[in-house]
Amino acid sequence: MKKSVLSAVVLSGPLLCAQAQAQLSPLGMWTPIDEASGKPSAEIVISTNAAGTLSGVIQKTWIVAPGASAACDKCTDDRKGKPTQGMEIIRGGKKLDGKDVWEGGKILDPNDGKEFSVRFTPIDGGKKMEVRGYIGSPMLGKTQTWVRVDK
């Protein structure tokens, strides 16, 4: 009996570690928290594309900024005039060697059409993520907390 319990513990250890490690990733569904209201503002699904870099798409939006359109009228690239729902707002980014941090990509604010460099850092065991948008240096940016959506 002791041998089978020990075997179960030894065999399940790697599975539990793999599950915990998988959570320390930006992949999955996230909801940004609106700074003004403190409420969720959207659902964004982050996956990897064929190149192995991050891609994030808005699945749903709940809060629209005053005067904002359901389309990205202020975008200056291929997203100009396209609906924000279903829009790819995260492009690029890879995991830094030896760290649970993803960088090198861009994130779009569809309310004003501005694009920023972005850094993703899972926190709280992967239940939350710090998303830092910046121009130039990460020190010159703004961090928003996103919450993982379990579905």
Please provide the spans of the model-predicted regions:
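Exposed loop/turn and edge beta-strand positions of beta-sandwich/beta-sheet ligand-binding modules
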Residues: 24, 40, 140
